[in-house]
Regions:
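Soluble extramembrane regions of membrane proteins in the secretory/endomembrane system
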Residues: 1-198
Length: 199
């Protein structure tokens, strides 16, 4: 589902339509990688590629379940989380990120490499329902829904539209890392479909 979402985002940004007009102030680098289950090697390989130096921020699309709504479960800071707030149906809470920080969640995502090894700022979005189907024979297209796909795709597209149209001085324009440091924040969805962020 994340791969389909990324491919559709690429199409939306390269062939804008009346329905998805896109004005870009910042570029997008789409990364489709593998090797997550073997020590995040796909992200580690990207980290040593010359194009990695062009990246400041990221939106990581994941799957830890077979459907439901895509949830924002980790964010580096309040500033990048505000991009996610632009989506029509944001879903997520800072509490899930606390689970990772406290070691309650044992698995990892490329978020770890992007933040710890590459110094980027960004967001981790994933499916988490039903978690019991993750990495089983039921973790397939037959056991998910179009609504789940549309939720991930919609939030990804709207988040990236906000990120690429951001003209603030928060992030450098020179194409080189460092990406700066954001402010810690508290965020959660409230009385759907809105999201609140405090920093």
């Amino acid at each position: 589902m994340a791969v389909v979402s990324v491919l559709q985002v690429i199409q939306a940004f390269t062939k804008p339509s009346r329905r998805t007009p896109v004005q870009v102030e910042r570029g997008i680098l789409a990364l489709l990688n593998n090797g997550e289950e073997d020590y995040l090697n796909g992200a580690r390989a990207f980290a040593i590629h010359p194009m990695a130096n062009l990246s400041h921020t990221f939106l990581n699309l994941e799957g830890a379940g077979a459907g439901g709504r895509a949830t924002l479960f980790r964010s580096t800071d309040a500033e990048v989380t505000k991009w996610y707030q632009h989506s029509k149906r944001p879903f997520g809470t800072v509490v899930s990120g606390d689970g990772f920080k406290r070691g309650m969640v044992k698995s990892q995502t490329d978020y770890k490499v992007f933040t710890e090894n590459m110094g980027m700022r960004g967001l981790d979005v994933a499916f988490w329902e039903p978690r019991s189907r993750y990495h089983t024979t039921d973790d397939d297209v037959k056991h998910t829904s179009k609504e789940s796909l549309w939720h991930m795709l919609g939030t990804a597209l709207e988040t990236l539209q906000a990120a690429t149209s951001d003209t603030s001085r928060e992030f450098d324009h020179d194409g080189e890392i460092p990406a700066g440091v954001g402010h810690e924040g508290v965020w959660f969805d409230c009385m759907r479909p809105s999201q609140l962020i405090w920093s």
